[in-house]
Amino acid sequence: MEPALKKMADPLNGAELPYDVSDEYRPEPVPIPAPPAWQDGSFRIGIHTSIAGDIAGALDIAAKLGANALQIFSASPRMWPGGSSRIADADAARFRGRRAGLGLGPLVIHDNYLINLASPERVMRTRSIQAFHDELVRAASLGADFLVAHPGAGLGAEMSQAIEDIAQGMRQAARGMKLGGLRILVENTSGMGSAVGSRFEEIKAILDQTTDLPMGVCLDTAHTFEAGYDITTEEGLEKTLDAVDPTVGLDRVYVLHVNDSKTPLGSRVDRHENIGEGHIGRKSFGRLLNHPRLGPGPQGLAGRAFILETPIDKPGDDRRNVRALWELVGIGVKQAPKAEEGFSMTRAEKKPFARSAEKTQKKKVSGGKSKGKARKGKKKVKTRI
């Protein structure tokens, strides 16, 4: 039987009109926000860049290295802030404007290394929650797309308790915040000590307890390999992806940290190496970057970002690693973003002829004399060149 409809008076003529309770409130449909400009399905290759001196300078560094994405720290990663660690509104606006001008994206921020949301020690836990809250505030002010977080270490606590503490800490840190388009990514770990997150099931448990937050996963190749997942063979990579999909879900892997490993398979020791110079090997990275289940596509976002966290043992290693990834995905120098020749985060590389010219200039200044100091009381004899 149809429910009886209420009657209401027509305000124009007083006649009674049928009235349905469901008509009381019909909210306007919420428009789906347009995706960021960088989500165009193209490859996004980035590198962790330095914020020393000027945080906006990190953007120029990424562009000069030939990257179209980047990762940064938003503050010192190995220090607790002594006071306010907020970024001034003017600086944040300048950063956002510069990033838009360079067309870089996504912007990934890595959290402070000292944060340990799994700590059973009360003071450390309180400090970590506050620091993670500050990370969220800074990331949102800079317009970041992702905040990558190390889960933490239980330091003797049961794994289930450590996971519960991590999830609760994240929720507490984000309470009352407007995160905008920011998504928190839990990074897998190598399994050193009591670190949480070396098994995908552990990361899934964190995600299952933070469903009220925008969450995702950052998959680190070195950590994956060091934790015992063999990604160096075609069969091993397939098995690893088969382990990821039913747990955290490949559709929630938004960022991959692309690092070779200085330590062997299953070492549980976190040591990054330059691409092709470690135990994973260049060929394995080519297979991984071109895998249809990991490459840019409509899974989750319009594309994934591949971010380098490789060491700079000599000037130019950073630029060479970026170029190596572009080569591995089959994008040549002409198609990839143009890198500035000789640029490095450490210092600009000097060409052989430049070093020779510098030595000649030093000889002219020193008169060709040795570096030893002249004896006191004796006058130096200048030699004509």
What are the residue ranges of the model-derived segments?
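N-terminal pre-domain/capping segments
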Residues: 1-111, 115, 119-134, 331, ...
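Histidine-acidic metal/acid-base catalytic patches
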Residues: 5, 10-11, 17, 23-28, ...
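Acidic (Asp/Glu)-rich catalytic clusters
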Residues: 38, 60-67, 86-108, 135-143, ...
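Active-site beta-loop-alpha junctions enriched in small/polar residues
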Residues: 48-52, 75-77, 112-114, 152-154, ...
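Active-site acidic/histidine proton-transfer and metal-coordination neighborhood
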Residues: 53, 117-217
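A general structural detector for well-ordered alpha-helical segments in enzyme core domains, enriched
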Residues: 58-61, 91-98, 131, 135, ...
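Conserved, mostly hydrophobic/aromatic
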Residues: 62, 110, 128, 139, ...
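Alpha-helix N-cap and loop-to-helix initiation/capping positions
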Residues: 83-91, 119-131, 157-168, 194-202, ...
